[in-house]
């Protein structure tokens, strides 16, 4: 009986690890993909200042420009589970069962999906809102 309880607890803890929020390993440079999954000239850099996520962006070979500094309406925060479920519903059906963690603000969300059997295999998504519509675009990590 004790072993069964330990196994249930272990399974619950292992499952929650896969659904954990973004962490330092998600920091990096990403190129935004278009709707056909081709790289665009838009790049984004996400990193943490202390516990706060911040974001820089650039077009092509231009210099990085600060975009979200962790204050005001651009402050990136851990996304609520209900919002994450809504965004996942926009993705292909075969991806919707994968755990996803996000940070968001008033304009966009940055999200990571991980395979439960291989958490190092990750997919990144950028969700943006415009005129009442949500757009889901892939991100390729470049650094």
What are these regions (language model features)?
Residues 30, 67-75, 101-103, 110-112:
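Sequence contexts marking disulfide-bonded cysteines in secreted/extracellular proteins
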Residues 70-72, 120-143:
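Edge beta-strand at a domain terminus
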Residues 2-10:
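Sec-dependent signal peptide recognition
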């Amino acid at each position: 009986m004790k072993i069964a309880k330990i196994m249930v607890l272990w399974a619950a803890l292992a499952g929650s690890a896969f659904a954990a929020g973004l962490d330092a390993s998600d920091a990096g440079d990403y190129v935004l993909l278009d709707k056909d999954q081709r790289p665009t000239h838009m790049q984004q850099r996400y990193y943490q200042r202390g516990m706060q996520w911040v974001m820089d962006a650039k077009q092509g070979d231009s210099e990085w420009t600060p975009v979200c500094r962790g204050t005001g309406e651009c402050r990136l925060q851990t996304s609520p589970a209900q919002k994450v479920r809504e965004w996942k519903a926009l993705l292909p059906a075969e991806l919707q069962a994968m755990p996803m963690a996000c940070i968001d603000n008033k304009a966009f969300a940055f999200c990571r999906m991980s395979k439960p059997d291989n958490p190092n295999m990750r997919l990144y998504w950028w969700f943006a809102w415009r005129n009442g519509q949500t757009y889901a675009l892939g991100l390729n990590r470049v650094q």
